[in-house]
Amino acid sequence: MKKIILALLLLSTFHAKAADTLYIKQPQVPILIERHDNVLLLMRLKATETKTLDNIELTLDNSLPLNQIKAIKLYYGGTDARQYDNKLRFAPVDYVTGFTPGKTLRAIPSYVVLRSELQPTTHRLTLPDKQSLFPGVNYFWVSIEMQPDVPLKATLNAAITEAIADGKALPLVDTSARNIQRRMGIGVRHAGDDGVTAYRIPGLVTTNNGTLLGVYDVRYNSSTDLQEHIDVGLSRSIDGGKTWEPMRLPLAFGDNGGLPAAQNGVGDPSILVDKTNNTCWVVAAWTHGMGNQRAWVSSKPGMDKDHTAQLVMAKSTDDGRTWSAPINLTAQLKQPEWYFFFQGPGRGITCKDGTLVFA
């Protein structure tokens, strides 16, 4: 009988704790210096008896001087659909999008309610809230905005150390991975930059001179794969990634053959630095025609551009400043019976014997 009573007590305690426990998650993604809002911590509270979240206490580690933080904000994200009541979700939507042109730098206003904002002067700070809780799941999150001169090598860790609701401390459960160190980053390309809808499929190399060269798809009209209006873009940095030069286009085919640019897409690039002489190579798939249908099913057996995708390259002998005209490798490498032949995107390597390898 004693065991049964003890089991019932434990079970009731578990349910009480689960109902009014603040669950916390810290995503392990870079903090982008140019963003006004970066998700620092996500919180979920399923309120059955709790009426108001009074405040939360945030602790920052000592790895970063506080004057390099421009703002800490507490947002309320509302609730979720009832079918997710028992799912451990931490947000109903992406509060800061990476895909909508012109909206990648700050929280989307219609998705959030700003509850408090401050510039930290101590490593332990209280964010006031006084948010009335929805009877069910409630979402909160902490945003961080950095000063523009924060070093790229800086790191940061943060934790929710206390949450007060209805005048009492809530139980806390942190679901984050252990010992997370958040690193700084720069968004080299954002949706909407230069009037482009999306940038995808990145590759990055360091030249013998220490220059960073990043390649990617420039997807002008949408994020859709080939066939579409897509060029291969390149960004260049000579200061370790702090600043980036204007975008270049190592591979672009325009209205080749009299067809529209959206039927001359080139993409899925890979980049390589020949370590023996610092020559830089970019390779990609060029698709001609195909009527804006997906290249995966529209590229057919054959060798000429009117029937099958072409494997093309461009090279730079001046550390990525300028690029050659396209070099077509299709006739040297493709078999006529193959449907679609191209390399995997990303980066290649230089072997010890000087052989250049794209996988």
Question: Which residue ranges define each predicted feature?
Answer:
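Exposed, polar/acidic Ser/Thr-rich sequence context and nearby capping/turn residues
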Residues: A19-R182
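Generic secretory/membrane-interface signal
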Residues: L9-F14, K168-V173, S237
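Asp-box/BNR beta-propeller blade signature and adjacent active/binding-site loops
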Residues: D37, T79, V113, F134-W141, ...
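Residue-level detector of intrinsically disordered/flexible regions characterized by low predicted structural confidence
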Residues: I4-I5, Y75, L105, P202, ...
